[in-house]
Amino acid sequence: MSLLLYYALPALGSYAMLSIFFLRRPHLLHTPRAPTFRIRLGAHRGGSGELLENTMEAMENSMAQRSDLLELDCQLTRDRVVVVSHDENLCRQSGLNRDVGSLDFEDLPLYKEKLEVYFSPGHFAHGSDRRMVRLEDLFQRFPRTPMSVEIKGKNEELIREIAGLVRRYDRNEITIWASEKSSVMKKCKAANPEMPLSFTISRGFWVLLSYYLGLLPFIPIPEKFFFCFLPNIINRTYFPFSCSCLNQLLAVVSKWLIMRKSLIRHLEERGVQVVFWCLNEESDFEAAFSVGATGVITDYPTALRHYLDNHGPAARTS
């Protein structure tokens, strides 16, 4: 045992020192990647706290606030039209208990006159525009605006249609593939490998594990965006579990694991933009930028724009 310790302890010490050294200097092992665009202000569902989610009116409002990114979810209609909709089932959005895929685009119902803001419980958005929009409409209206397109399920036809639209409108570098599932992301990458990738849940866990094991400086990272929930919002505006105690436990553990300046700085220097969602209060904006986040995704782009304009360069510290 003593002989094992004699060799193991120096080896572990050397490994730890090397890991810390390269964690702080990733450019010595990896070629820095210059971003095509940077996300400071991302509009969740087009800014669903100010106007009805995913409508053209909401998108226009977000762009008036100089949003850097429109965060979208897409579904496929029966006649193979890619529409911007968070839910597959239309009941919450319109009151009609039908799936998007069971209707042609022209038969899709209007949104309700008001919709509750998911990450601001008790708050409702209204708007004069209640029509669902096609993804192609947004590509035509905002040809050079970066967008994140999240795929919820394993709908290969939807993935192919989106990949084709991105190519047709020459948006390969400014349209991000997003999905929670690695199996779905694999299909997205195969359909259009030129589009930048965001982390899936399992890949995010792998990065955290690698960071705490000291492996992160030595492994390749193909993703360019790390979209992550801010632990501060758990049990306040975000309730992943029905049990309050579990939510509180997750808030404490995830805050300890994720809110690390050295982790975020390393990812940034590797060309990975760290963007926290879905933050709707100034205290949360402050929490995200204080640990060095690239940007924030919000339901209230006007509030975030006001914060960024008032804080200037100080909104991002490292």
From Swiss-Prot:
It is found in: Membrane; Cytoplasm, Perinuclear region; Endoplasmic reticulum. One of its GO terms (biological process) is phosphatidylcholine catabolic process. Residues 24-198 are extracellular. One of its GO terms (molecular function) is phosphoric diester hydrolase activity. SUPFAM superfamilies: PLC-like phosphodiesterases. A divalent metal cation binds at residues 71, 73, 86. Pfam families: GDPD. Widely expressed, with high level in kidney and ovary. Residues 1-2, 222-318 are cytoplasmic. It is a multi-pass membrane protein. This is Lysophospholipase D GDPD3. It comes from Homo sapiens (Human).
